[in-house]
Curated annotation (Swiss-Prot):
InterPro entries: F-box-like_dom_sf, F-box_dom, FBL60-like. PANTHER family: RNI-LIKE SUPERFAMILY PROTEIN. It comes from Arabidopsis thaliana. LRR repeats lie at residues 9-34, 146-173, 180-211, 219-244, 271-296. This is Putative F-box/LRR-repeat protein At3g44080. It holds the Pfam family F-box. Keywords: Leucine-rich repeat, Repeat. The keyword Metal-binding does not apply. Residues 6-60 form the F-box domain.
């Protein structure tokens, strides 16, 4: 195939040539500036920068090479590249050997701040080291997309952090040190293990627990699994969501019971028949609970010998709102609602969310059946809603 002659591209408009340069790596794009003054000017108009130390510090045979002159050359290369820029749209920085090759935090931070000062909207950092991100990074008013990885260690986040236009955040293998004490909303998915992690989660307000067992060797795993630490750490939350698999793990692993959840005001609970004993225990341990959301009630509607067993509710409960998710409309589910209405004297609102689409006639019938149910509270209102 005939090789393309750069001179033959001189007839193309600047806008098109800039687009072509933008599709190249920064190192390739820089090399075009040697062609002529026009190409040097065109390169300065490219808004995307891709900096990667791998191409400078690694030989083709795979061995590392570090020479001070190469390090200085790399720093000068990046400094010149940034100096030629006005506005920067995308800035990507990959450094696999930040400290091994003598690149200090101050140098890299200067590059990041330089890009931020030029209004960068997409920032991609892949720095395989413990790294203190500059303060200016946490208060950017132009960042729309941010990706951090791989192996980057972020030791602190300022309380004044504000990224008002950020829409996309991608984190890959990021380590946050000593930040758990500032976490407010936590989704925790894990496999129970013999030695459970210790976390400082005093600031938590909302938690979703999604614990799972490995089905292979189930009996062996459940015998040594430990969830005591994580359950103890979340005892001060205000909102708690337990998936059905988390309830299963808790029912098997917490033989010594549950802590008291004095601050818990909202509980979303999903379970199966054989683990339904966890709910009464949790309600007993949550003296200030006001909102109870039950999902998949049809799964644990029967007790032994296929007989109805109502959910045990503490006599002094303060529940004001009761919701049923995935409601099938069965007679047994209706018995559960009837049972709960008689046990909750503070109840004000009952919301029933249907599992599947139902015609208006059936929905009306369900509403009528539930409205007729006797209740301990004279203020209760029942709402039936579609899926």
């Amino acid at each position: 195939m005939e090789q393309l002659n750069p001179a033959s591209m001189d007839c193309l408009p600047d806008e098109l040539l800039v687009e072509i340069l933008s599709s190249l790596t920064t190192k390739q794009a820089v090399s075009t500036s040697l062609l002529s003054k026009r190409w040097k000017t065109l390169y300065s108009l490219v808004h995307n920068l891709d900096i990667d130390d791998y191409i400078l510090f690694h030989r083709e045979d795979g061995y590392h090479r570090y020479r001070p002159d190469i390090q200085k050359s790399f720093e000068d290369f990046v400094e010149r590249t940034l100096a030629f820029r006005g506005h920067i749209k995308t800035f990507s920085l990959k450094s696999r050997e930040l400290y091994a090759f003598g690149l200090g935090v101050d140098v890299v931070n200067r590059w990041i701040c330089n890009a931020l000062e030029r209004g960068v909207s997409e920032l991609h950092l892949c720095i395989n080291s413990q790294f203190e991100l500059p303060y200016k990074f946490f208060t950017s008013t132009t960042l729309v997309m941010l990706s951090l990885g791989r192996g980057l260690v972020c030791s602190k986040i300022p309380p004044e952090t504000s990224l008002p236009v950020l829409k996309i955040l991608f984190l890959y293998s990021i380590w946050f040190k000593d930040l758990t004490r500032h976490v407010v909303d936590l989704y925790y998915s894990d496999l129970p293990r013999r030695k459970a992690p210790h976390c400082h989660l005093d600031s938590l307000a909302k938690v979703t627990l999604d614990l799972h067992y490995l089905r292979y060797g189930y009996q062996k795993v459940q015998n040594y699994a430990n969830v005591k630490n994580i359950i103890s750490e979340i005892r001060n939350v205000k909102t708690l969501h337990l998936t059905s698999s988390a309830v299963e793990v808790i029912s098997v692993c917490r033989k010594d019971g549950l802590p008291v959840f004095n601050n818990l005001v909202e509980l979303m609970f999903s379970s199966r028949k054989r683990h339904r004993k966890v709910l009464p225990l949790l309600l007993e341990r949550s003296p200030n609970l006001e909102t109870l959301i039950l999902s998949d009630l049809y799964r644990y509607t029967y007790g032994r010998r296929h007989r109805f067993v109502g959910i045990q509710i503490p006599a002094n409960n303060k529940i004001k709102m009761l919701s049923f998710m995935q409601y099938q409309g069965s007679a047994t589910e209706l018995k559960h609602i009837s049972h709960l209405l008689l046990k909750m004297e503070c109840l004000e609102v009952v919301k029933v969310y249907l599992a599947t689409e139902m015609n208006d006639l059936k929905k009306m019938q369900l509403t009528e059946d539930e409205v007729k149910l006797p209740a301990a509270s004279s203020k209760v209102k029942i709402q039936v809603m579609g899926s």
